[in-house]
Amino acid sequence: MNDDAPQKHAVVTGASAGIGRAIAEFLLRAGWRVTGMDRTAPTLESEHFRAVTADLGIGADVESIAAQLVDADALVHAAGVLRVGRIGVLDRHAGELMWRIHVDAASILCNTILPAMADRRDGRVVFIGSRIAQGMPGRGQYAATKAALIALSRSWAAEVAAQDVTVNVVSPAATATGMVNDPARSASSAQLPPIGRLIEPAEIAQLVGYLLSPAAAAITGQDISICGGASLQR
């Protein structure tokens, strides 16, 4: 643990629970100053943690907050929601909600924060994607939003690579978070990967921490899977 005053500033969405909380907690232990964005009350306490209440599904709110975060050295977009449904019974409103939280929020935040990183010639962006981006029955709308994050990350990575800014996606398989027990996904339960257990949020946090480090300066535009061997089954 770094006992010195944190120098780097990370913005983490979805920081009150699940993967986002694990990432924020890991970064705090590593000596970062963290701003956590979430619509629910913060669950972390640290002198180096600042909670910002925000509904990432409301674009105007995200835009207003993003303008206050241009000093961020890293952005981790971990906020997410899952709604399931097969073709013929798709819920348009559920699809729109997932698009706003996953894709629109990422676009709004990056539209403000990424240019500032490029101007400083230093920065890291990580989106939390999903292996489901490759497609899965009953989760087409969710998959589309996560696939969009991969397309955005590769496009933006190409735009800012020469300014020493990296943009990557970390795509977990089923993870041990509250989302696994969400009643909204009861029609499509999580499947255990070959390792026989769910991915732990702390495992994802450590991978994200590496991508934010100087050692990962040459990794950009990548979709990195942490799947417990699930990809071996295809």
Protein language model regions, located:
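Catalytic Tyr-X3-Lys loop
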Residues: V81, G88-I108, D122, V126, ...
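Conserved mid-core segment of classical short-chain dehydrogenase/reductases
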Residues: L82-E96, G138-Q141, M179-P183
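Active-site helix of classical SDR
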Residues: C110, T145, S153
